[in-house]
Amino acid sequence: MRLCVIGDSLDVRRYAVALVAQGHQVYWLASTETLRTLHNGAAPLTVATDILPATCQYVVPVQTYHYEGIRLMCVDQECWQHPDLHTRLFTYVCLFQRALPCAVLHTWSPWPIAYLTIYTARFLAVPAVLSYSSQLASAKLEQPFLWDWVARQVAAAIVPSPAEQERLLTLAPLSARQVQVIDPTQPHLGQTLTALYTRLGAATP
C-alpha cells in the first residue's frame, strides 16, 4: 500500500516507521524545520534524487531524503507556514497523487496543514485521516466553521486515549465509530493502522 503522511508532529515519524515495517511505501510530507529534529536522531538522512515525480519538481521548493525506509519530502518553511502560499502546496499534493496514487492521506498538526490536507483529500476523493491533538483543539474557538467542516469530511479521526476520544466527541460532529483510539506507543501500531486504512479504502467508492 502506498501512503502519504503529512505534518510536523513528533508522532508522524513513529507512525511512518511502523507503516514501513509493515511493508508499505510511505511518503512523509513535512517542512524543512522537521529536518532539525531528525538530524538530531540516530538514524541517518540520505539525500534522495529518485522519489519525486517530475511534475512536482518546480511547484514548491522541496528537499527529498531517504530516512528509515521513509521517502521524506521537506517543503520550504515559507510555503509551509503561510496560508497565502498553500494554493501551491495544494497543487503539489494533487500532482503528486496523480503521479503516485496513495490509498490514504493521513495528517497531523499544524491546523492550516491539517485543513489543507483534508480539503485536498476531499477534492481528490481519497480517504483522509486526521490525528487530533491539543494543538488542533484551539481551532474550535478560532475557526469554528472550518473545524466543523473538517470533522464532517474526515474518514477517521485518531486520538491516543479513551479520555481524548470522549473529549473530541464533545467538541466535533463525529461519531464514536469515526474516532479511533490508537496509542502511538503500542507494539502493533503498524498492524492497527494497516487494518484501519484497508477498511477506509474498501469503503471509498
Each language-model region and where it sits:
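Histidine-centered beta-alpha loop that forms part of the nucleotide-sugar donor binding/catalytic region
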Residues: 7-8, 110, 132-136, 183-184
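A short, charged, and often flexible helix/loop element on the N-terminal side
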Residues: 47-92, 107
